[in-house]
Amino acid sequence: MNNPDLKTILSSWQGTPVDKHGRFMNHEFPGTQTFGNALKWTFEKNPQKQTKKNDTWHMQVVKDDNFLHTEEDVVVLLGHSTFFIRLDGKQLVIDPVFGDLSMHTRYTDFPIETAKLVNIDYVLISHSHYDHCDKASLKIIQSQNPDAVFLAGLGMKDLLSQWVGTNEVQQAGWYQQYKLDDGLEIYFLPARHSSRRFINDTNKRLWGAFVLKSKKKTIYYGGDSGYGSHYREAGELFPGIDVALIGVGAYSPRWFMLPNHQDPQQAVQAFNDIRATMMIPFHYGTFDMADEPLSEPEDILSKAAEGNKVKHQIRIVKPGEAVILD
């Protein structure tokens, strides 16, 4: 399945796979976690419970919105999986989540006033899970940016259109390029994940990763993903990626999380597969969404980076900290 109105960049690709029920599938690792497995995890004992209780670590936040008032190419983690990016003067927000979620308290303040997120050209939504696709945050973005274009995966338009009014929504299949007319190129690529917002919509909306390509810079945003060959494929399709944004948290217990979230060691391997110049980790420290302590992803990532001799290429940033792309 794909969007016939969009260009497919991989000539051999036959379209995003679906099962007999019309549900999207991971092409390398078909299948998804069952509701029974989710219940099992919910009620089983967390072996790291006491360690989590004793963990006093909190991510520091940089409350400086100066990056909003410059013209430089920049990447800014705003917490969890939310990014502000500027490339060639075009401003983008990825997976905006500004506050608490219905089942998760936010542990880090949002680093800027949301009212200042104006002049946004594109809003990218990697998938439909609540910690990436937040109704309240999207309504704020839309109200302040009536001309912003929303870019997402197949099946997302019906959901987003309820919240973003008459703003344009484009939905893509994997290996498809969105229709933009300003010189910026944005592509939707595979990720190893799943989607669900309600009991009856499992994998009805496509998940994925993004590649953003300007005249001078290329950025990869991995969304939520387990480890797989799609990282190597992204590096081959887009050689010379400058920055890879890769999730490193919500990976424990492995028996349950492995298909959907890589652990920090696998994130380093993914970075090596992509062959990017720099990695910025995300998806940790803001919400408590798994068994591991909030501090653990960063600790393990640092050790894995040292062991893989990529310590100086992995940039651990604070929410609100601007990374200027020279």
Tell what function each PLM region has:
Residues 1-102, 113-116, 153-221, 242-249, 300-321, 325, ...:
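Metallo-beta-lactamase
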Residues 99-101, 105, 110-178, 190-195:
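Active-site HxH/HxHxD metal-binding segment of metal-dependent hydrolases
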Residues 95, 125, 187, 246, ...:
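Redox-cofactor binding/interface segments in oxidoreductases and associated redox assembly factors
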Residues 77, 150, 171-177, 207-210, ...:
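Tryptophan-centric aromatic hotspots in well-structured domains and transmembrane helices
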Residues 3-4, 12-13, 19, 24-27, ...:
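Cap/insert and terminal regions of metallo-dependent hydrolase folds
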Residues 84-86, 179-242, 258, 262-265:
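Catalytic core of the metallo-beta-lactamase
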Residues 96-110, 194-201, 252-261, 288:
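Acidic/histidine-rich helix-loop elements
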